[in-house]
């Protein structure tokens, strides 16, 4: 029989009685009740002097008590020292369940086999049919969800049953809750405390996506006592390390910063890890985190670990990562392979064929006509985003910018500002193309073409999200780029041509060229944007469609506000980060210069 421990409430009652307060308010308290102190029964009607002597005697005997009894007392007070910012105190009703656990950081937990997560019969459609804990259901109801999406219906029950899952679903399908709900249920069932360390680890490819998952976890865990946190590149590493040392039960992280903490933060307790989630695995590997992921998987404990790996596409690298991270015989779930289209149903997709010198004019006209809409515009490089943001804001067309060269605090503030806005324009690189759940986006504009059809799908996935979501997308194509439509058709992406009458386009070309010619800072920014555009174009993976040598540089320059192409120093062959796909296939030697030099001479002649 567990030994009762005084709660704060009972101690407070005794203090009131000691100072003459009435003994109780309920009718049941009219007669004296026994109170329990350190295993001894006393009457509440004792005098203060008798109480004091008994407490003193109890303290002396406490020193001689067995270790097991001491552990119970320690566990009831240990959580009080944790930071309120990141570590929340456990509910009083959970205190008795800490008996027999190790004292100090990293206390061992019972095996997953010792607890039973909720099981379901048949094919549940609503969250209420999952038999989830009351606290989790409160969080789901607070978020306003009732009916599950297809990926949630097919993944949550097997994950609750302890299966490893390799999942594939369209962006915007609701997979974040698919992995968070089973993870939170596991933490709750095992009664994780801060001192137990990290039990669930979610790895995300970008900082913005990590912040978004963190926001969902915060809402879902609002009624749970377990702690949650986030570690991402660009944030304060020392503050992160302090929180990890105090104990973060559910941790969201980007790969680089996670590996840093695993290797260099001594107080980071991860020996009790029960669930590993790798979200957007294909994107993690695409942006160069393959080595980091292999090291992370190797460092983390594999015994009793459930792994969930989600990827929009199943590449060879994703399969390799699945092989080393998942247990044998994982459940493969693909909710898209039977669908007619690769994009969501409520998305109206179109393209416009536009000469390079008219591209900015068309974009400017479109944004001016849609000031009351919420729009995301995608560019190919950070410097292109910077230039167009500076230009549009200068000419009183306010926009927000998001790209990889910004400091983390700026990126975070911009992301949440646009999320909370009812209207406005965000111009960005592909840093915002994967996984981000930005509410009520009306239009996706692909000003610069995507690197391939997969990037196209993820870009347009920022709109028409969720059940019955609606949205529109528009892609700008030059006449030489129409071959990309064939690739979209092969990828089951339905697009139609949009027509913009010439008389609807505001011709501000002369004013633009005058502004760029006279404003030193805009001129410098325009040159950097122009150079970055050419470099990004030359690094395109679909060279047969996007051939940098077919570009009309005079028209490209006009699109950036120059009457004639500026003289810039550019070496295309030495900086093509995306050429790695081609290099690995032996199509081109890394660092070779023939194409770059040829282009440079052509440019100087202009």
Curated annotation (Swiss-Prot):
Residues 58-74 have a biased composition (Basic and acidic residues). It catalyses: ATP + H2O = ADP + phosphate + H(+). ATP binds at residues 169-176. Residues 346-516 form the Helicase C-terminal domain. One of its GO terms (molecular function) is RNA helicase activity. InterPro entries: DDX18/Has1_DEADc, DEAD/DEAH_box_helicase_dom, Helicase_ATP-bd, Helicase_C-like, P-loop_NTPase, RNA-helicase_DEAD-box_CS, RNA_helicase_DEAD_Q_motif, SPB4-like_CTE. Associates in the nucleolus with the 60S and pre-60S ribosomal subunits. This is ATP-dependent RNA helicase has1. It comes from Aspergillus niger (strain ATCC MYA-4892 / CBS 513.88 / FGSC A1513).
């Amino acid at each position: 029989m567990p030994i009762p421990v005084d709660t704060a409430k009972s101690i407070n009652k005794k203090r009131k009685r000691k100072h003459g307060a009435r003994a109780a308010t309920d009718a049941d308290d009219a007669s004296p009740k026994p109170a329990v102190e350190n295993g001894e029964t006393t009457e509440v009607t004792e005098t203060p002097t008798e109480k004091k002597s008994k407490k003193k005697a109890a303290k002396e005997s406490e020193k001689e008590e067995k270790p097991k009894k001491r552990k119970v007392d320690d566990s009831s007070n240990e959580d009080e020292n944790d930071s309120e910012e990141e570590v929340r105190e456990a509910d009083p009703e959970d205190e008795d369940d800490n008996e027999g656990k190790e004292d100090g950081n990293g206390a061992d937990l019972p095996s997953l086999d010792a607890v039973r997560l909720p099981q379901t019969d048949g094919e549940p459609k609503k969250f209420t049919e999952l038999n989830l804990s009351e606290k989790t259901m409160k969080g789901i109801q607070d978020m306003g969800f009732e009916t599950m999406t297809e990926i949630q219906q097919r993944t949550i029950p097997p994950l609750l049953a302890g299966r490893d899952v390799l999942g594939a679903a369209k962006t915007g399908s609701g997979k974040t809750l698919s992995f968070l709900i089973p993870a939170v249920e596991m933490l709750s069932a095992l009664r994780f405390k801060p001192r137990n360390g990290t039990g669930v680890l979610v790895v995300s490819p970008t900082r913005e996506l990590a912040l978004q998952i963190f926001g969902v976890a915060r809402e879902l865990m609002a009624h749970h006592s377990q702690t949650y946190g986030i570690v991402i590149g660009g944030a304060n590493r020392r503050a992160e390390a302090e929180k990890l040392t105090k104990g973060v039960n559910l941790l969201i992280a980007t790969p680089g910063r996670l590996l840093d903490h695993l290797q260099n933060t001594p107080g980071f307790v991860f020996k009790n890890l029960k669930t590993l989630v790798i979200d957007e695995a294909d994107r993690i590997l695409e942006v160069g985190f393959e080595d980091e992921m292999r090291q992370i998987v190797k460092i983390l404990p594999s015994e009793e670990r459930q792994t969930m790996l989600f990827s929009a596409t199943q590449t060879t690298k994703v399969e390799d990562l699945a092989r080393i991270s998942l247990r044998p015989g994982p459940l493969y779930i693909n909710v898209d392979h039977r669908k007619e289209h690769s994009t969501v149903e409520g998305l109206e997709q179109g393209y416009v064929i536009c000469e390079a010198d008219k591209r900015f004019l068309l974009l400017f006209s479109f944004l001016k006509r849609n000031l009351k809409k919420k729009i995301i515009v995608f560019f190919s490089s950070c410097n292109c985003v910077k230039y167009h943001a500076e230009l549009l804001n200068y000419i009183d067309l306010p926009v927000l910018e998001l790209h990889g060269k910004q400091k983390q605090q700026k990126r975070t503030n911009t992301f949440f500002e646009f999320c909370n806005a009812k209207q406005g324009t965000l111009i960005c690189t592909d840093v915002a193309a994967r996984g981000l759940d930005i509410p009520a986006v009306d239009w996706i504009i692909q000003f610069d073409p995507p690197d391939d059809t997969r990037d196209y799908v993820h870009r347009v996935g920022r709109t028409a999200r969720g059940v019955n979501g609606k949205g529109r997308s528009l892609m700008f194509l030059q006449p030489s780029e129409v071959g990309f439509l064939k690739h979209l058709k092969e990828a089951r992406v339905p697009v139609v041509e949009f027509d913009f009458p010439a008389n609807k386009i505001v011709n501000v070309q002369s004013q633009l060229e005058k502004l760029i010619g006279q404003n030193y800072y805009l001129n410098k920014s325009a040159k950097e944007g122009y150079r970055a555009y050419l470099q990004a174009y030359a690094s395109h993976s679909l060279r047969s469609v996007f051939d940098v040598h077919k570009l009309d540089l005079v028209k490209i320059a006009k699109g950036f506000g120059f009457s004639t192409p500026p003289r810039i120093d550019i070496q295309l062959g030495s900086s093509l980060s995306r050429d790695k796909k081609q290099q690995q296939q032996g199509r081109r030697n890394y660092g070779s210069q023939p194409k770059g030099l040829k282009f440079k001479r052509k440019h100087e002649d202009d």
